[in-house]
């Protein structure tokens, strides 16, 4: 099964790296994918992550390397305009930063793994129900 990993799943795994989420990410059971945009989001919030995790920068980079090692990163340029448009229609009232994740899920007919309940609720109201709930 292909699973699109949202940024907040990575954040949660970093904040509690012994969590069930981190274990699932480190496992080889599912094929995880994410847009390159995930990197931007992580490094945009790097200082906040360091503060909350109390990790050193080297420890954070090592943990990120482990967590991201099982994720295949995909450029949004490889997503069809049809999938991007559907994702835009679904995300425009929530947060356009979610668009690349939703578009990947549509493009690959994949499950979306997110902890963003506002996003889940809105997508469900628009008949998107392909959520990964481990």
Give the location of each predicted region:
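Active-site neighborhoods of divalent-metal-dependent phosphate/nucleic-acid chemistry enzymes
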Residues: 73-115
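A generic structural signal for short hydrophobic patches within well-formed alpha-helices
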Residues: 10, 39, 119-120
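Acidic, PIN/NYN-like endoribonuclease modules and their adjacent C-terminal/linker elements
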Residues: 34, 102, 106-134
């Amino acid at each position: 099964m292909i699973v699109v990993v949202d940024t907040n799943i990575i954040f949660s795994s970093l904040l509690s790296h012994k969590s069930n989420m981190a274990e699932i990410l480190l496992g080889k059971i599912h094929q995880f994918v994410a847009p390159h945009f995930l990197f931007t989001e992580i490094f945009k919030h790097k200082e906040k992550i360091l503060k909350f995790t109390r990790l050193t920068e080297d420890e954070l980079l090592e943990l990120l390397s482990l967590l991201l090692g099982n994720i295949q990163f995909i450029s949004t340029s490889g997503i069809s305009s049809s999938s991007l448009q559907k994702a835009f229609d679904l995300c425009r009232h929530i947060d356009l930063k979610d668009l690349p994740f939703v578009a990947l899920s549509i493009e690959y007919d994949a499950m979306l793994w997110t902890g963003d309940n506002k996003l889940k609720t809105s997508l469900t109201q628009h008949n998107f129900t392909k959520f990964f709930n481990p």
